[in-house]
């Protein structure tokens, strides 16, 4: 069942060559979001995985992690907290910086977004180099959360992010993966 589901989801994701720059193949989830059946299948896959786990919150990484994470939080009857790009939150924040291949960036959360000991599922659409996901994990942990698992629709294992997340001891669940030849 999981293999058929993953293949359905994988077939719905659009690959856009040379975007945002030459040599990059962008994995576009908007066709998946536009198709109500496939979107429901994706959400159900996550719901069935997490419905029996003891979770307090779902955290979603800016921006596509908000889409999946908020729907998943609703379906699991949990709260949702955003992990935002720097400068997007209006209240007191705490930030975690990370390195990109072309510079640095930061993610932020409100200082009161999680309480010590809360069990959090972290969600994003894709894991590539792992910078954003690792920064979000560190940020949640600094705020006192227990990151039960990180989850993404897509893994690009050749870029090393999933291995870096695994090295932190945080479990990672992904639905499908792509290599550079695809």
Swiss-Prot record:
CDD domains: PRTases_typeI
Pathway given in the UniProt record: Purine metabolism; AMP biosynthesis via salvage pathway; AMP from adenine: step 1/1
Enzyme class (EC, first level): transferase
Chain ranges passing through the membrane: none
InterPro entries: Ade_phspho_trans, PRibTrfase_dom, PRTase-like, UPRTase/APRTase
Record key words, sorted: Cytoplasm, Glycosyltransferase, Purine salvage, Transferase
Glycosyltransferase listed as a keyword: yes
Location of the protein in the cell: Cytoplasm
Protein name: Adenine phosphoribosyltransferase
Organism listed in the record: Bordetella petrii (strain ATCC BAA-461 / DSM 12804 / CCUG 43448)
Encoding gene (name): apt
